[in-house]
Structures are given as C-alpha cells and as structure tokens.
C-alpha cells in the first residue's frame, strides 16, 4: 500500500489558567503529480473528506513536581484507490500521562515517568469488499500500551528504559505472509523494550543512541513471517544528532 505523502491541516489550541489545554486540527489530502481533480487511483490511501484530530490535557505543578494527564484521538475515512464508493473508517482513542520529579538533594536531577494507551477501532468495509479482499472481515481493533521511565543527570545526560505492547484481531488477509514484514498466523501482536541514552554537550547540540528489542513481532517470536525470520531479527539501533542554530 502506498502511503499518504501530502496532506494539509488547519488547527488551533487554547490554554486556560496554565492548567487545561484543548486543541484540534482538521486535515485533508490531495495527491500531486496526478490528474486533477484527484480520482484516487494514483495512491492506495486517501483521506475521504476531513480527518479530525483532538487533544485535551490537564497539568498541574508544585515546587518539585509536575503532572499531566490527557486524552487525544483521530477519526478519518478512506476509500482505498478511489474517491467514491465504499469506505474504510478509523477511530483512535488514547490516554496518556507524565509525571516529573525534580530531586534537589541530587543536584536537581529529574525523574520522568510516562505512559500511553491507544485503542484503534477500524471498520474496513471497502477493504473486505475489494476484489481480491485486503481484509478478511470488517471490524478490527488494535491496542497499544507503552510506558517508560527517564532519568536526567543534570541538564547534560539522560537515560530511558521502556516497554511496549501491541495486540489486536488476528486476520490472515489483512496481515498476510511475506518475508520480513509478513505474518505467519495473521496476528498483529508485538512486544518489546526500548533503551536509550542522550547527551547534550552544549545547549544547541543533542546526541542520542536508542536500542529497540523485540520479544514478539507480528504475532510470533520465532519464524513469525513463515520465511524463517525471528522477532529479534528486527532489533535495531537508532542514532541521532541534532544541531540548532
């Protein structure tokens, strides 16, 4: 499936009393380099009409503590490979929190704890009715849970450790067998951990190294793609350098 490459959005936000944040954005897509108006055949994925994103959060703080809890989500519809006809729809609901604690007795080091839960409900009417079908049935859901703890040593170095989990409906048509990206049993289940360290030698320079490890990937820990690949074959190291002028 070709991924959406061009999208425009218009949004706004408001903060009340330094505690309550409310924001929202409307998006729509239009693919360039194709016939206009867009007939949908240039790309495998289009936003049908308008996609809505929202965010509501509440934060409070004291001398050495800061706490935030919120919710966010998005709703959109798509007609795969077209601009009319049957639609697939997606609705994401999410909740998140973050707690930061400054530790004065340790030179104001900061401990941060973060967590996120996302529920994606999808109604794949168009995909299930396609010829050939790209989904085995209409109603699907995905659950994503992620939590992490980060420790800041002063304002130069920080380390992070986190866990993540993805579960949902098994559908061999939606998640077919294929080398590397494929799926032996049609399950989207993935689980793993993230470890990272960041260093800022100067205020405008940031260096980060992150390691992601998988215990399960696409429903399995061994031979998950029916081509002999194990979940830990997707373990990866990510390096980033940031310079601000």
Annotate the PLM regions:
Residues 32-88:
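Loop-centered beta-sheet repeat module
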Residues 11-13, 55-57, 96-98, 148-150, ...:
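Outer-membrane beta-barrel architecture
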Residues 1-5, 117-132, 170-172, 213-224, ...:
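Outer-membrane beta-barrel translocator/channel fold
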Residues 199, 205, 231-245:
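Outer-membrane beta-barrel "beta-signal"
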Residues 66-195, 199:
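Detector for outer-membrane/organellar transmembrane beta-barrel domains
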Residues 1-57, 230, 235, 242:
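Surface-exposed coil loops of outer-membrane beta-barrel proteins
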Residues 197-211, 216-218:
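C-terminal closing repeat unit and adjoining cap/tail of repeat-based domains
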Residues 5, 49-51, 90-92, 142, ...:
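Membrane-spanning beta-strands of outer-membrane beta-barrel proteins
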């Amino acid at each position: 499936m070709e991924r959406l490459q061009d999208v425009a959005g218009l949004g706004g936000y408001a903060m009340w009393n330094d505690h309550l944040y409310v924001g929202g954005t409307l998006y729509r897509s239009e693919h360039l380099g194709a016939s206009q108006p867009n007939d949908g055949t240039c790309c495998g994925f289009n936003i049908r009409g308008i996609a809505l994103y929202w965010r509501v959060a509440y934060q409070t703080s004291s001398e050495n503590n800061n706490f935030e809890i919120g919710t966010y989500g998005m709703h959109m519809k798509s007609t795969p490979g077209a601009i009319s006809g049957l639609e697939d729809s997606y609705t994401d609901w999410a909740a998140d929190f973050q707690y930061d604690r400054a530790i004065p007795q340790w030179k104001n080091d900061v401990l941060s704890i973060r967590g996120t839960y996302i529920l994606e409900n999808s109604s794949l009417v168009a995909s299930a009715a396609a010829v050939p079908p790209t989904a085995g049935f209409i109603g699907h859901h995905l659950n994503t849970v992620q939590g992490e703890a980060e420790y800041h040593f002063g304002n130069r170095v920080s380390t992070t450790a986190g866990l993540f989990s993805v579960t949902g409906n098994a559908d061999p048509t939606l998640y077919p067998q294929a080398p590397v990206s494929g799926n032996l049993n049609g399950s989207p289940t993935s689980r793993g951990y993230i470890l990272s360290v960041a260093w800022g030698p100067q205020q405008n320079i940031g260096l980060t190294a992150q390691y992601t490890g998988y215990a399960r990937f696409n429903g399995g820990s061994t031979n998950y793609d029916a081509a002999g690949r194990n979940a830990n074959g997707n373990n990866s190291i990510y390096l980033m350098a940031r310079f601000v002028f």
